[in-house]
Amino acid sequence: MKKIEAIIKPFKLDEVKEALQEVGLQGITVTEAKGFGRQKGHTELYRGAEYVVDFLPKVKVEVVLADENAEAVIEAIRNAAQTGRIGDGKIFVSNVEEVIRIRTGETGLDAI
């Protein structure tokens, strides 16, 4: 099994969610996140004072799925989240050893 974590721009969430549904993914976890990379921050003026905003708002999308579905999901996320500008985000892929559904005790792919 694979865990795919994608850090994307918040306004791209609906497009990513729809793309994941189109490739047959049934569940996702979404978390608000803040961060910066090459995009860095920017300065804002608030009540006459200039502030540096280091961390930019992002959204983290997480999915766990069968190995054979990983490439389709990665492509769906990449195509839906891409704007071609700095700050589009990152996709991280890692192996998952086990999944357990708390309610039933099911394990492995049955628990996803």
From Swiss-Prot:
Q: Choose one Gene Ontology CC annotation of this protein and give it.
A: cytosol
Q: Can the keyword Acetylation be found in this entry's annotation?
A: no
Keywords in UniProt for this one? Nitrogen fixation, Nucleotide-binding, Phosphoprotein, Transcription, Transcription regulation
Q: Which residues carry this modification: O-UMP-tyrosine?
A: Y51
Listed SMART domains: P-II
Q: Drop me one GO molecular function for this one.
A: enzyme regulator activity
- Example GO biological process term? regulation of nitrogen utilization
Which Gene3D superfamilies does UniProt cross-reference here?
Answer: 3.30.70.120
* PROSITE patterns, per database record: PII_GLNB_CTER, PII_GLNB_DOM, PII_GLNB_UMP
Tree of life domain: Bacteria
A Pfam family matched by this chain, by name? P-II
Could you describe the subunit structure of this protein? Homotrimer.
- Function in brief: In nitrogen-limiting conditions, when the ratio of Gln to 2-ketoglutarate decreases, P-II is uridylylated to P-II-UMP. P-II-UMP allows the deadenylation of glutamine synthetase (GS), thus activating the enzyme. Conversely, in nitrogen excess P-II is deuridylated and promotes the adenylation of GS. P-II indirectly controls the transcription of the GS gene (glnA). P-II prevents NR-II-catalyzed conversion of NR-I to NR-I-phosphate, the transcriptional activator of glnA. When P-II is uridylylated to P-II-UMP, these events are reversed.
The record's similarity note reads:
Belongs to the P(II) protein family.
Record-given protein name: Nitrogen regulatory protein P-II
What species was this sequence derived from? Rhizobium meliloti (strain 1021) (Ensifer meliloti)
